[in-house]
């Protein structure tokens, strides 16, 4: 799914982002004609349904061979916060696009729950923007299964908004793993992985300090989601996820951050994918914590201290022998100029793995 604008503003960057969106369509056509993109096309508040459907950009998207089409020929179509426009508005868009030769199947992306029944009359699929903090249940699939043909489930790593000094705490990798687990257990039809590459919400962009760790984790859970079978772990991998400072760190400038109603979670996590049992260790300054882990996936968390500057160290041992070890690429600071609560992440692999024919 890629964002576009039906009527991009001439000065606020929407045209610039649109160039990249169309470049993705062109790349998909050139590199893999079987790879299709679901266009999510924004509208301004005052744009009429007819002007939206007749937009030069909408027509370009509709004519592109990389745009996702259903077996019945309809073009899959979406927009973030679909409910910001009325059902009647969307009916007129659908009628106009059909008259223009491009019937669409609307996949609603919702930020709320109260209009789902109304939109069930016109939506081929439904997905929610989702939760950004882990919980016990997110009944999206159960709620929307009777209302639509396809149910999409949201997948996100974290939500850190520098522009408002506001963050929802994902508790290291917990939100990402929890959302994937629920999508699998609830048998969602689609998974919507929100990368947010406009750098405004820091969800999963690989050029940030989280690196490619979320993509490694997503690759594992995508296979599980698509096949219905948990993938076998055939090599040891350690992933560390932590913030660069405590939420209550001494800051020299700026205002404090708002962590929402759940509050901050100050922990260092070592997430292990193990082929067999082992001992996990986390070293913080002069103190070492350890946990016995079984084969499979183990999350090991320890408190992130508030007034200590250090570089976290991580290791996996078996029978007293170090299998994998390494330091975080990101030091933890005891004071900062401006705080940055976005999580950092990295991967550690056994040093001798390549000699074993990996």
Model-derived regions: residue spans:
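Glycan-processing catalytic domains of CAZymes
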Residues: 1-269, 275-358
């Amino acid at each position: 799914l890629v964002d576009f604008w039906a009527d991009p503003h001439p000065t606020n960057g929407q045209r610039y982002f649109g160039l990249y969106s169309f470049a993705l369509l062109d790349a998909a056509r050139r590199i893999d004609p079987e790879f299709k993109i679901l266009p999510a096309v924004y509208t301004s508040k005052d744009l009429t349904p007819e002007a939206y459907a007749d937009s030069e950009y909408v027509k370009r998207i509709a004519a592109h061979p990389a745009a996702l089409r259903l077996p019945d020929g309809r073009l899959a179509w979406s927009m973030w916060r679909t409910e910001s426009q009325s059902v009647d508005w969307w009916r007129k868009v659908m009628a106009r696009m059909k008259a223009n030769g491009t019937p669409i199947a609307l996949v609603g992306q919702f930020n709320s729950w109260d209009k789902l029944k109304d939109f069930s009359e016109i939506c081929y699929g439904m997905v929610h923007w989702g939760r950004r903090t882990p919980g016990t249940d997110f009944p999206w699939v159960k709620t929307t299964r009777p209302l639509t043909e396809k149910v999409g489930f949201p997948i996100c790593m974290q939500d850190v908004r520098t522009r408002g000094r506001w963050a929802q705490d994902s508790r290291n990798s917990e939100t990402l793993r929890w959302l994937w687990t629920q999508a699998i257990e609830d048998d969602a039809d689609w998974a919507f992985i929100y990368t947010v590459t406009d750098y405004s919400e820091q969800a999963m962009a690989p050029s940030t300090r989280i690196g490619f760790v979320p993509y490694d984790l997503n690759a594992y859970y995508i296979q599980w989601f698509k096949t219905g079978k948990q993938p076998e772990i055939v090599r040891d991998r350690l992933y560390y996820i932590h913030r660069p400072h405590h939420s209550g760190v001494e800051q020299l400038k700026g205002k404090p951050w708002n962590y929402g109603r759940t509050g901050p979670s100050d922990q260092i996590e070592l997430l292990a994918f193990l082929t067999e049992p082992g001992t996990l260790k986390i070293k913080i300054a002069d103190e070492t914590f350890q946990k016995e882990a079984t084969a499979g996936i183990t999350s090991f968390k320890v408190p992130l201290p508030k007034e200590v500057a250090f570089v976290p160290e991580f290791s996996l041992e078996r029978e007293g022998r170090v299998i994998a070890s390494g330091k975080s690429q990101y030091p933890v600071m005891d004071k900062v100029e401006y705080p940055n609560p976005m999580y950092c992440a990295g991967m550690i692999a056994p040093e001798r793995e390549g000699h074993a024919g990996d």
